[in-house]
Amino acid sequence: MGGEAPEARRLDRAMSFGGAGSIPEEALHLVLGYVDDPRDREAVSLVCRRWHRIDALTRKHVTVPFCYAASPAHLLARFPRLESLAVKGKPRAAMYGLIPEDWGAYARPWVAELAAPLECLKALHLRRMVVTDDDLAALVRARGHMLQELKLDKCSGFSTDALRLVARSCRSLRTLFLEECSIADNGTEWLHDLAVNNPVLETLNFHMTELTVVPADLELLAKKCKSLISLKISDCDFSDLIGFFRMAASLQEFAGGAFIEQGELTKYGNVKFPSRLCSLGLTYMGTNEMPIIFPFSALLKKLDLQYTFLTTEDHCQLIAKCPNLLVLAVRNVIGDRGLGVVADTCKKLQRLRVERGDDDPGLQEEQGGVSQVGLTTVAVGCRELEYIAAYVSDITNGALESIGTFCKNLCDFRLVLLDREERITDLPLDNGVRALLRGCTKLRRFALYLRPGGLSDTGLGYIGQYSGIIQYMLLGNVGETDDGLIRFALGCENLRKLELRSCCFSEQALARAIRSMPSLRYVWVQGYKASKTGHDLMLMARPFWNIEFTPPSSENANRMREDGEPCVDSQAQILAYYSLAGKRSDCPRSVVPLYPA
């Protein structure tokens, strides 16, 4: 939205005359029905008015990457036959407590437009937005009779009262997604009503919420919803789920629950999972409970062990029994030894996530930790990998080179170097990063959060030079001077979204770099050499480019949170983005809109 398509996707305007202009309207409708990539769609719409109109009439899905980038009324008027709409709200940093609660991203302007004109809308996905009970009531009134998919991902502001209204009124729901939402629990009736009124329900997810679960309601859900294939819930003791598992014959994916009384073998001995289950994520599972997975471990395609109490040895034993895994999520307690088992066993693995574990140094020494050794082993052994996200305690250029050499299908790579080790083996990582980017030519998303000295100006220049088709980047503690940032910006021809943290760059250099990146649509920065007013940021001012500055709070300048991170408002932030909606009207006092003024 709001920018030119990359050169390779330009279509000749002359095509609309003579050859392309003679194509029957029905044929164009049919052909465009098979064009889903939004960048291809954008290129089509720029050919001529006729193609622009047909694109508008045939567009079935739109993702708004930032809720303030477009006017709800204008966007929905342009695409009157949308079947699904996704809107993203607060910056990703909100997931890590770096954005104030009152920052904005209110769903109301969007919900208010979802009325009669959108007769085809069946699916709505809101991410990191503030959604109230009134918003959901308005949505039910407007779209409840047609809504088949409602996803509220990491949203806040609503209660189970609104969920009960959704459950009673939206009787065609196939998907209800509420993962990591902050929901006021006013009772469990919503789940009972959902089971009674939605027999076609296929996916229900309220994982990582604090909602109360009544086992009888889950059993009713299994009885009434014969097509239920995916269920992710909040904490509920596994001994209370035996009846549900017995009745949920179609279930293929389950996550949540809890082994509340660990070590009670007799209590959980009767837990039997459905025969079709191939995706599993268990909570609070320890060594003694692990054997309940063994009977069907060879059938598992997805396994999430992030919220278990398993040791390194437990990971090794369990993963050795899972040769068909496509997706694996663990904490770094898996250690290099565990990743060695992954490399030997999981030859089909496509996605690997290694999250940060316990920060207790003693525990890390006992259980291991992930370093260049484990990453290298996985790169060599799991050559189908498309996604790697890992928190590591040590890393080398050689490990990154191995990933570039062997992981040719990699589309998304994210690495965070933890600061618990005093010395890192091999810094800076300039040559390793260059080798990875040159080797992994399919990369579209790239994140690198290092420690001071982790990447020199030369390495930062390599990222720009070899960024290829990368559209999203998160960089932290990279570069040495403003010169490195300018060299980085000379590349990045296809970069659309950039996030920077803990960097040494000046406001002036940031503004110059941002202005010089041709495809950039969104940038968020925290922790840089900020001025009190952000005046140098005006160097990047241009039409349709909103600039918001959050000055540091003098009161909290040196205050730290309990986890050792700076307070939310102790460091200046920049948010700049293309917008066809103009200046937003709901900025909190902590945010200063610089442009448009």
From Swiss-Prot:
Transmembrane segments: none annotated. Jasmonate binds at R92, R353, Y391, R414, R501. GO terms for cellular component: SCF ubiquitin ligase complex. Residues 22-64 form the F-box domain. Keywords: Jasmonic acid signaling pathway, Plant defense, Ubl conjugation pathway. InterPro entries: COI1_F-box, F-box-like_dom_sf, Leu-rich_rpt_Cys-con_subtyp, LRR_dom_sf, Transp_inhibit. The keyword Magnesium does not apply. Disulfide bonds: none annotated. SUPFAM superfamilies: F-box domain, RNI-like. One of its GO terms (biological process) is regulation of jasmonic acid mediated signaling pathway. It comes from the Eukaryota. The keyword GTP-binding does not apply. Pfam families: F-box_5 (PF18511), Transp_inhibit (PF18791). Expressed in roots, shoots, leaf sheaths and leaf blades. Involved in jasmonate (JA) signaling. Required for jasmonate signaling in plant defense responses. Can complement Arabidopsis coi1-1 mutant and restore jasmonate signaling. Component of SCF(COI1) E3 ubiquitin ligase complexes, which may mediate the ubiquitination and subsequent proteasomal degradation of target proteins, including TIFY/JAZ family. Plants silencing COI1A and COI1B show increased plant height and seed length, are hypersensitive to gibberellin, and display reduced sensitivity to inhibition of seedling growth by jasmonate. PANTHER family: AT02038P-RELATED, F-BOX/TPR REPEAT PROTEIN POF3. Interacts with TIFY10C/JAZ8 in a coronatine-dependent manner. Interacts with TIFY3/JAZ1, TIFY6A/JAZ3, TIFY6B/JAZ4, TIFY10A/JAZ6, TIFY10B/JAZ7, TIFY11A/JAZ9, TIFY11B/JAZ10, TIFY11C/JAZ11 and TIFY11D/JAZ12 in a coronatine-dependent manner. This is Coronatine-insensitive protein homolog 1b. It comes from Oryza sativa subsp. japonica.
